């Protein structure tokens, strides 16, 4: 977890309500300060640094994109403007084009009113807490002392529509075959993948039906996408396809639906692809990196299939940090952020979709069969407002109650009590074989936390 107390940056960049808390003025300043920090080590003194900029389909995206680009140009940085494109495509193109940094304007799976700014370093990875802290220090200085070049010292912006095709060609190379004859349903969340789905999946030979591919600036994630898979499940059943694939607003997540309309979440996708890689001898250390929020059914399925797991804090950045630190090549989150480190530096919904379809084609198995070993346990999460979340988490009575519940579970269930990273909340999460037991155990622990809450 971060040792820095960050004011603007959260776990996934700078986010807020567009034109309210995330204003064009702030975006301009982020362009100046972020640009200065990220390009200070640019190698060629005779050439201006280059930053690439993409966005999702939100109505505020153009406004914020223009503002941050103006900030970059004002400190002498050239910009390649990608237009509407996915977040993982920006990460890929930073490396492919040897740019000094990348920026995506997006709020991922959030509603249309929100937006955000994600930075990538020249290695294609999200920024470290240290770099974010340095940007914030510059942002909060009382006077802007950064360079203000003029004439030919200013940056220049150019459109780069070829970026999309480069990214799609890269994706196709991650599987060694086409997908001829596969029948699928695709949900673009009215977001960044909307214009890419038909191009990619037609080239690979699939037959497909789509929804959520008509963005109007306001309908991103609205009743569609990876956080709203019910519409896709209906489309799958109506059209008798082999699988449904739902992406989020910026294309870094995937939630699948099997041929029966049942949800295949990130845990199941990690198991399916991990088992396939392991059987091929390609899963490093026979292990998958996941967060503490992955379901106990996922962990049991891994163990029953000769694999192990490494747990991290919640957030795909922490998954990636662990993957780099311990040299693993598969990791992700229940929410559908899946990282294939052999190919990518961040979660990528389209890349994950291709790997999942490839496993289906190679094994000849239905998606429901591949997911069957993962028996998802019922889960309940309760958020309790407390005066001091750290103190309550370590209260002897709370610890004793957790131990009592865990003893009753006898290994067939799980308790996770953790503080919120941003709010005065203690989160109590319980998984057990039945919903009745989940309710019983959750309330048992939550009642003790409430008694000790100090409120």
From Swiss-Prot:
Pfam families: PGM_PMM_I (PF02878), PGM_PMM_II (PF02879), PGM_PMM_III (PF02880), PGM_PMM_IV (PF00408). GO terms for molecular function: magnesium ion binding; phosphoglucosamine mutase activity; phosphomannomutase activity. The active site is at 108 (phosphoserine intermediate). It catalyses: alpha-D-glucosamine 1-phosphate = D-glucosamine 6-phosphate. One of its GO terms (cellular component) is cytosol. One of its GO terms (biological process) is peptidoglycan biosynthetic process. Keywords: Isomerase, Magnesium, Metal-binding, Phosphoprotein. Its cofactor is Mg(2+). SUPFAM superfamilies: Phosphoglucomutase, C-terminal domain (SSF55957), Phosphoglucomutase, first 3 domains (SSF53738). Belongs to the phosphohexose mutase family. This is Phosphoglucosamine mutase. It comes from Leuconostoc mesenteroides subsp. mesenteroides (strain ATCC 8293 / DSM 20343 / BCRC 11652 / CCM 1803 / JCM 6124 / NCDO 523 / NBRC 100496 / NCIMB 8023 / NCTC 12954 / NRRL B-1118 / 37Y). The lineage of its organism: Bacteria, Bacillati, Bacillota, Bacilli, Lactobacillales.
